[in-house]
């Protein structure tokens, strides 16, 4: 190091020598007047001039001076300084070059030779000093790229799937992802949608527009039977309806499109979710009752098994099963069950106890009744009556008492596209009824030998989906694809309880997440795992700078990145198949949606059809009258059932004691 320093000092001395020679030769007359010329030097310089022409131009000696100055600066190591910047270096260097090289004309000014020489030497010296400062600063410049990537984007970018992998079930989404300082085109290939999919994201993150809509369209194109829960009806329903009209060729048997909509009976089909033909056991009645009551009382989800939770569920289940066995299930509808529940409990218990299969089922109520524990009994009954009374609505009764279609949507002989619409303003009422449709559909479609089908639930926490965890776990073998959309895991835990929420989170194979924050972002970051990342550190002391590079396992997609995703940007992971391996399952990309194409398609959309025309032959709208008449008919039928059953029991010698006990 000392030897190198001596060489650099020597080069700098040579550089200064060339500057002095330049002044000596081109300012000779003035220096002679000052008495600072030497004959020996004169001879040496004249010999150089004759042999090399070194002084034929004022620039040659300057160029040699600058070359040796540059070499001396390159080999010099200075103490690194953060405050030195390229801007300062460039300014100093530019000033030096101008003063050093562009001052020859000062020797020709119409001034005394002494003045010309002083100006020339001053500018030459100032220029040289500026260039020397620039060179010194270059050696002291702190050269590092530590702050070039302050958000660690390069370390956290990775190669993603660029192949399009299609099969008869797949959902394929085009993407753009950042890797190695450029944007690349890629694909998210959901080659096995039957392993269930989750779409997470805060409101406005693009989960419906980028993912849910694409699922609906592509699965209709590939001939799936479809069940869609449309929380903001008719957003998803119109997409499904219009896409079906344009892609009927994807089905071997032309599917029918059905709508359940409580807000507008004109645009709704009628369907009885507890149709007697699909209820083979009292357990089916219990499932229906369970779904209804937990949708009406979300706080009960975390209290399952408690006495005052199970009691109203069992009571409603007994009433549903009674309607199933009474006259072959002729009156087995949910509105009939509500009306029967609201009759005098003495009559209801008397009727239900007259059926052996219900006697043991109702024993807790009967025991309380016979022991005259009226407060307990009334509390049990009120727990069922009060929430169910919110569902007494002529429009709801109308929709739930018809039989326009059955809920086996993936029947190969009669495939269906079914959309059910909710209303955010009436969510608490409608969700209970729609939850009943959900639970029945899950039971009916999750069977072998059926058509491939899809269950799409957007805004999942707005409805309690009984049996969802079991559907996810078993649907793969029955070709049922499940897509669930919601905002984050905490929302799911709040509405489904911790245990069921954890099961749903951990059994889903395909995950899409837009912007989410908090615990959800941390859970997802852990799911995506860690990757080997480069770490660079720098140490600066008075003598030198040292840089060290190390590697460390760190989060591939940190929670902070997930919390700040732009609209349309998604992170996630997909599941693959034995014969369709996807090595890089994780993605962090923008899902590309052709906005212009979507606008053109939307502009051509037709409105959902009117299902029922309530106009009479005179052109008058009779909807309210017909719906009210249906409501009144149901109430009258239930009154008649009670009267007929009480009469039957009174006239039956084996059952009449039930009446007598009550009368006493």
Predicted stretch roles:
Residues 69-76, 435, 439, 510, ...:
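Hydrophobic alpha-helical segments involved in membrane association or supramolecular assembly
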Residues 8, 229-230, 514:
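Active-site-adjacent beta-strand anchor residues
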Residues 177-183, 297-307, 535-552:
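Low-complexity, polar-biased intrinsically disordered regions enriched in Pro/Ser/Thr/Gly
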Residues 1-205, 209, 214, 541-542, ...:
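Basic- and hydrophobic-enriched, low-structure N-terminal and domain-boundary segments
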Residues 22, 32, 36, 142-147, ...:
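P-loop NTPase motor domains
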């Amino acid at each position: 190091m000392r030897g190198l320093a001596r060489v650099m000092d020597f080069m700098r001395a040579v550089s200064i020598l060339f500057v002095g020679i330049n002044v000596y030769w081109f300012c000779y007359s003035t220096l002679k007047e000052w008495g600072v010329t030497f004959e020996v030097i004169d001879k040496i310089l004249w010999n150089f001039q004759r042999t090399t022409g070194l002084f034929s131009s004022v620039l040659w000696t300057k160029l040699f001076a600058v070359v040796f100055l540059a070499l001396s600066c390159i080999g010099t190591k200075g103490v690194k300084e953060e405050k030195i910047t390229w801007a300062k270096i460039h300014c100093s260097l530019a000033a030096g070059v101008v003063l050093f090289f562009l001052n020859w004309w000062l020797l020709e000014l119409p001034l005394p030779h002494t003045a010309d020489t002083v100006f020339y030497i001053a500018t030459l010296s100032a220029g040289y000093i500026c260039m020397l400062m620039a060179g010194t600063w270059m050696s002291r410049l702190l050269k590092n790229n530590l702050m070039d990537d302050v958000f660690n984007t390069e370390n956290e970018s990775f190669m993603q799937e660029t192949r399009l992998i299609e099969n008869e079930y797949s959902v394929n989404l085009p993407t753009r992802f950042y890797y190695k300082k450029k944007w690349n085109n890629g694909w998210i290939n959901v080659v096995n949608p039957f392993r269930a999919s989750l779409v997470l994201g805060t409101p406005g993150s693009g989960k419906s527009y980028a993912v849910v809509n694409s699922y609906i369209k592509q699965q209709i194109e590939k001939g799936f039977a479809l069940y869609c829960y449309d929380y903001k009806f008719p957003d998803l329903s119109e997409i499904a309806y219009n896409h079906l009209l344009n892609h009927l060729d994807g089905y071997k048997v032309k599917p029918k499109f059905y709508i359940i909509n409580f807000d507008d009976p004109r645009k709704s089909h009628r369907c009885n979710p507890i149709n007697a033909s699909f209820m083979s056991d009292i357990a089916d009645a219990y499932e229906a009752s369970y779904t209804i009551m937990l949708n009406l009382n979300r706080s009960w989800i975390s209290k399952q098994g408690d006495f005052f939770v199970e009691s109203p569920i069992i009571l409603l289940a007994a009433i549903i099963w009674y309607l199933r066995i009474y006259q072959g299930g002729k009156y087995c509808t949910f509105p009939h069950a509500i009306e029967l529940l609201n009759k005098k409990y003495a009559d209801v218990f008397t009727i239900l106890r007259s059926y052996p299969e219900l006697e043991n089922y109702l024993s807790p109520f009967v025991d309380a009744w016979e022991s005259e524990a009226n407060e307990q009994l009334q509390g049990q009954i009120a727990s069922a009556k009060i929430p169910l009374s919110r569902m007494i609505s002529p429009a709801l009764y109308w929709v739930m008492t018809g039989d326009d279609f059955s809920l086996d949507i993936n029947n190969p002989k009669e495939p269906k596209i079914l959309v059910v619409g909710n209303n955010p303003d009436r969510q608490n009422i409608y969700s209970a009824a729609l939850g009943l449709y959900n639970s029945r559909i899950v039971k009916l479609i999750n069977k072998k030998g059926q058509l491939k089908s899809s269950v799409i639930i957007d805004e999942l926490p707005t409805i309690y989906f009984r049996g969802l965890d079991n559907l996810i776990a078993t649907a793969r073998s029955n070709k049922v694809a499940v897509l669930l959309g919601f905002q984050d895991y905490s929302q799911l835990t709040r509405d489904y309880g911790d245990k069921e929420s954890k099961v749903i989170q951990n059994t889903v194979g395909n995950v899409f997440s837009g912007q989410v924050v908090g615990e959800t972002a941390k859970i997802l970051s852990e799911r995506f795992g860690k990757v080997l990342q480069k770490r660079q550190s720098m140490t600066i002391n008075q003598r030198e700078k040292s840089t060290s590079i190390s590697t460390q396992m760190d989060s591939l997609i940190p929670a902070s990145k997930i919390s700040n995703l732009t609209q349309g940007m998604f992170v996630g992971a997909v599941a693959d198949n034995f014969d369709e391996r996807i090595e890089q399952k994780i993605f962090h990309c923008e899902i590309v949606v052709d906005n212009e194409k979507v606008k053109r398609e939307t502009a051509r959309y037709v409105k959902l059809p009117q299902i029922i025309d309530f106009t009479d032959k005179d052109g008058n709208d009779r909807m309210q009258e017909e719906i009210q008449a249906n409501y009144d008919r149901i109430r009258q039928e239930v009154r008649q059932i009670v009267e007929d059953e009480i009469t039957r029991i009174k006239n039956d010698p084996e059952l009449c004691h039930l009446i007598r006990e009550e009368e006493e």
